[in-house]
């Protein structure tokens, strides 16, 4: 039996190895070469052995130094193209997006855990257009977002109160965990109408979204289910699905009772809930596309996976940079004190008048993008920069590399928010996060850009400004002691994952600014 299996695998490996590299199907592209590629391409694994760094973006940077800003690899049997400059980003994500690169690459984990209905991942088409329009017009429109502003303010003040208690007791605070609680509770209340505690499950979902199995890339292994990958997917699904089922059922009961009261909202009951809007559409027989329960579940997972971990991780990176760069922290504090004053707490509406705080957010996303490697799938072959890009190829955009490339950023390894405020009238000050400046794409670009970019950046800026206004953060070392002087810095080591979090939790003892903290308990 083992001999037969070994022979079978050897034959498969030889078949994959000897199978020719796909060439362009259309006559107009047949004369074009594929992007440069390392030699040799190994049987079975292709070029996977070249990804020898713990973090994918670092391996891709090393390869780009040898093969240029546009090169091709084989992840097992899957053709893969790596893109590493803003100029090429624009060709892929703007010039040719509509025809060739409007679809994202999905793994089995993404398909299963989003019920194969993720608006972030489903192929471009009528359903995607319909759901995207629903999200932008009915869930994330200005009126709805503004109605939920008090809720977001409450969640930020919860964080500040926890920090104030830590400051009073001098007990070290795991800031990493508090930030995850903040984003989980905020998204949960906006989406579901209650603070459902699912951050551990959401974290596991994001973790496996950022992982790959050999079965994703070596097609003969798909039926074999090698390793624990599929089992982990099933385990996470079996934990997550009952929670969503329970919340939807509970929400339907609340809606039923509300109808019996002729739509009257009870005292203390949240009036604006995203899930209500989705259930309204599901019950509307006149809708052009009928929304199913599975599609609603997929959207719930979308909001949690996109809004919980990524915002918490980015905010933690920002706080870490502020701890390590006291000059930036002092300048930010002076701005907050000048604009907001010391008689009230920062409000989300203040962010528009805090340009340096907004620049800190941009600088954080430049150095620590939520998605360091953005993925698309080529759905129609095309020509890019004199090369043929084959249909079905996985496209990897190394956003992390561009954010630290000295060709596009002055002193790129320095955390310097001023770069977004300098040279008034030209240059960096015009760079925003909306996907039109291809040297800064933390939320993607084009049709597949994250729809919640404004909500995420406003929340992050408000929390940062609030913490800056109220506290200093004293770093706690491994032994639980507060670090002083040059030792009072935090590690900026990255960890593997879809959003590339810090490798170590941020643990601090907050130090209250006496003028601000009492207001936390009187508001």
Curated annotation (Swiss-Prot):
Bilayer topology term: Single-pass membrane protein
GO cellular component, one term: intracellular membrane-bounded organelle
Origin superkingdom: Eukaryota
Keywords linked to the UniProt accession: Endoplasmic reticulum, Heme, Iron, Membrane, Metal-binding, Microsome, Monooxygenase, NADP, Oxidoreductase, Transmembrane, Transmembrane helix
Database matches in InterPro entries: Cyt_P450, Cyt_P450_CS, Cyt_P450_E_grp-I, Cyt_P450_sf
Enzyme's top EC category: oxidoreductase
Annotated EC: 1.14.14.87
UniProt: heme binding residues: 450
Catalytic function, reaction form: (2S)-liquiritigenin + reduced [NADPH--hemoprotein reductase] + O2 = (2R,3S)-2,4',7-trihydroxyisoflavanone + oxidized [NADPH--hemoprotein reductase] + H2O + H(+); (2S)-naringenin + reduced [NADPH--hemoprotein reductase] + O2 = 2-hydroxy-2,3-dihydrogenistein + oxidized [NADPH--hemoprotein reductase] + H2O + H(+)
Biological processes per GO annotation: isoflavonoid biosynthetic process
TM regions (residue ranges): 2-22
Pfam families (alphabetical): p450 (PF00067)
UniProt keyword Endoplasmic reticulum, yes or no: yes
MF-aspect GO terms: 2-hydroxyisoflavanone synthase activity; heme binding; iron ion binding; oxidoreductase activity, acting on paired donors, with incorporation or reduction of molecular oxygen, NAD(P)H as one donor, and incorporation of one atom of oxygen
Subcellular localization: Microsome membrane
Cofactor (UniProt): heme
PROSITE patterns recorded: CYTOCHROME_P450
Function: 2-hydroxyisoflavanone synthase, which catalyzes the hydroxylation associated with 1,2-aryl migration of flavanones. Converts liquiritigenin and naringenin into highly unstable precursors of the isoflavones daidzein and genistein.
Family: Belongs to the cytochrome P450 family.
Protein name per UniProt: 2-hydroxyisoflavanone synthase
Organism annotation: Glycyrrhiza uralensis (Chinese licorice)
